Amino acid sequence: MAKKLFIKTHGCQMNEYDSARMADLLGESHALELTDDERDADVILLNTCSIREKAQEKVFHQLGRWKKLKAANPDLVIGVGGCVASQEGEHIKKRAPHVDMVFGPQTLHRLPTMLDSRQGAETISMVDVTFPEIEKFDHLPKPTSDGATAFVSVMEGCSKYCTFCVVPYTRGEEVSRPFESVMEEVIHLADQGVREINLLGQNVNAYRGENQLGDEIDLAELIGCVAAVEGIDRIRFTTSHPVEFSDSLIEAYGEIPELVSHLHLPVQAGSDRILAAMKRGHTVEEYVDKLERIRALRPDISFSSDFIIGFPGETEEDFMDTMNLIQRIGFDASFSFVYSPRPGTPAANLEDETPEATKKQRLAILQERLNQQTMQISRRMVGNTERILVTGFSPKDPGQLSGRTENNRVVNFRAPNPTELIGYFVDVEITEALPNSLRGDLASPARY
């Protein structure tokens, strides 16, 4: 009987990508098969995230639950990866000695060797959280995909060192993946039926990959090359930094139809004073100028962003500046949360006199405004016929198909031949706007 692998993933899309590659890697090296039940697993991996508050405690709470599984099955192998693993390293083994392996985002390709060492000599403490550049992509097997969409990591790390952010310390400095390596993966995925590619990086628009001739390829050029791959009809990218949003990338919205009419561009705050304290490297007006230039090329584009509320020193005036920016741009959605200090970052040492109750109240006001704007945009879509990439059945209603619009809205609809439409584009007339999705009717039986 094949041995089983269980992976629990916290955090961002980059972690989702890394977890999928771990499954591919261990499937090839040790014939491990994925399971959805941790109780059936022979190997359990926890892929961690350090962005949100109490990330470490969340990890150790999960490891505490798995201690019982280890006691019942001493042969069970438990590994911890991701950004918390980079931060904590050996401390994870000290606090949770039942953990067998600790590895960082840049060393997940060494999992087969670590697993062999663990199984061969149980007393060896396997901890590897180094930053070996982009080496891991040279050792990972070709990805497998059974869906219409896929993530492709094009770079690792971040060199911006925003004062609130732990990513440069857990993922390392920016390193771009070679151009040919990215394109080989995209072509391989397209051959498996993938229609939409999401290019990933902590600061993806800083991508500067070399081709075999030694020429530098930026993100705009990469997107153009991905768009030329037969079968790829949609391209997204995330996450971006405003400073790196180049003229060529802006112009891509007028030149590459496969690039979707949706952009997630984190701004974090609408106050120049707070942006400077965050060391973001740009002003509000510089940010707005980029979005206005993109909107001139794509009038129907939707923008989403990230917002941190209650950054140390934030005044009521600073908060209102953020609210004004939200209304001015007409953001479609956001990831927004109350600031919490990340250990080892400069902002963790700043005085913070704003009461937590005030921060939570501001967050509620911001989220209410954004929810209103989201619904306004959704309601304007009612009556439109939208091009939907069908990704599968609705999790809440298996009788309905589910897919996404260009502006990243989930659309649920019924069809007489549902299984034949999965993985294809169809035209759907939007009939109803709901808080988190849209409903529609199939406008044409044709798939393409």
Curated annotation (Swiss-Prot):
Signal sequence annotation: none
Pfam families in alphabetical order: Radical_SAM, TRAM, UPF0004
CDD domains for the chain: Radical_SAM (cd01335)
Domain Radical SAM core: 144-376
Keyword match tRNA processing: yes
Keywords of this entry: 4Fe-4S, Cytoplasm, Iron, Iron-sulfur, Metal-binding, S-adenosyl-L-methionine, Transferase, tRNA processing
GO molecular function: 4 iron, 4 sulfur cluster binding; metal ion binding; N6-isopentenyladenosine methylthiotransferase activity
Residues reported to bind [4Fe-4S] cluster 1: C12, C49, C83
Positions contributing to [4Fe-4S] cluster 2 binding: C158, C162, C165
MTTase N-terminal domain ranges (all copies): 3-120
Record domain TRAM: where: 379-444
Cofactor note as given: Binds 2 [4Fe-4S] clusters. One cluster is coordinated with 3 cysteines and an exchangeable S-adenosyl-L-methionine.
Recorded superkingdom: Bacteria
Main location as per UniProt: cytoplasm
Subcellular location: Cytoplasm
Catalytic activity field: N(6)-dimethylallyladenosine(37) in tRNA + (sulfur carrier)-SH + AH2 + 2 S-adenosyl-L-methionine = 2-methylsulfanyl-N(6)-dimethylallyladenosine(37) in tRNA + (sulfur carrier)-H + 5'-deoxyadenosine + L-methionine + A + S-adenosyl-L-homocysteine + 2 H(+)
Function: Catalyzes the methylthiolation of N6-(dimethylallyl)adenosine (i(6)A), leading to the formation of 2-methylthio-N6-(dimethylallyl)adenosine (ms(2)i(6)A) at position 37 in tRNAs that read codons beginning with uridine.
Record family assignment: Belongs to the methylthiotransferase family. MiaB subfamily.
Known partners and oligomeric status: Monomer.
Protein name, as recorded: tRNA-2-methylthio-N(6)-dimethylallyladenosine synthase
Organism per entry: Chromohalobacter salexigens (strain ATCC BAA-138 / DSM 3043 / CIP 106854 / NCIMB 13768 / 1H11)
Name of encoding gene: miaB
